[in-house]
Amino acid sequence: MAKLTKRMRVIREKVDGTKLYEINDAVALLKELATAKFVESVDVAVNLGIDPRKSDQNVRGATVLPHGTGRDVRVAVFTQGANAEAAKAAGAELVGMDDLAEQIKAGEMNFDVVIASPDAMRVVGMLGQILGPRGLMPNPKTGTVTPNVAEAVKNAKAGQVRYRNDKNGIIHTTIGKVDFTPVQLKENLEALISALKKAKPAVAKGVYVKKVSISTTMGAGVAIDQATLETAN
């Protein structure tokens, strides 16, 4: 068995894996234990009461966090004409059509989000094997295939997070950085949970949001008492 580092021993001693933490206590604990030499992200795992084997129970979408994610997001947009000018004005770093596709085929992937107008999907569709495995393929469900590319760019820059359940029915995403205030992290988490509740599949039965845990990049997960969150039902 691998020997625990001193840091991991401290984390294990401090975090009670059997306890549900009040949100403010959980954030305070994460901040106390975030001793890495960089500003760690605060990540969230949400266990959903869905059957991920059934396509009509999969949960996928996007929402803009009120306080952003703390990341500088570089955006590439496939579009043309007036939409191209609008995308540039909204702050997109890369805008194009076939020329942008050629850059990507050549391995130039200096972006975090890809957005496309519907008329550009004939070009983007040929990049599926490159963009798909990286989670970058535009999709209407996440608002990244849209006629209003300028709004999509602004959302991406404002701190939009995309979510999609994994094969175990768990959503993994980020809600900010450990140097955010407790209020910012709480409100970002509440916004995410509210969005997930709105995206609940009609056929899902029983308890929908089963467990919510937050952690830092290098830390352990802390389970949240959902009663301490203010979310839309």
From Swiss-Prot:
One of its GO terms (biological process) is translation. The keyword Transferase does not apply. Binds directly to 23S rRNA. The L1 stalk is quite mobile in the ribosome, and is involved in E site tRNA release. Protein L1 is also a translational repressor protein, it controls the translation of the L11 operon by binding to its mRNA. The gene is rplA. Keywords: Repressor, Ribonucleoprotein, Ribosomal protein, RNA-binding, rRNA-binding, Translation regulation, tRNA-binding. InterPro entries: Ribosom_uL1_bac-type (IPR005878), Ribosomal_uL1 (IPR002143), Ribosomal_uL1-like (IPR023674), Ribosomal_uL1/biogenesis (IPR028364), Ribosomal_uL1_3-a/b-sand (IPR016095), Ribosomal_uL1_CS (IPR023673). PANTHER family: 54S RIBOSOMAL PROTEIN L1, MITOCHONDRIAL, LARGE RIBOSOMAL SUBUNIT PROTEIN UL1M. Disulfide bonds: none annotated. This is Large ribosomal subunit protein uL1. Pfam families: Ribosomal_L1. The keyword Ribonucleoprotein applies.
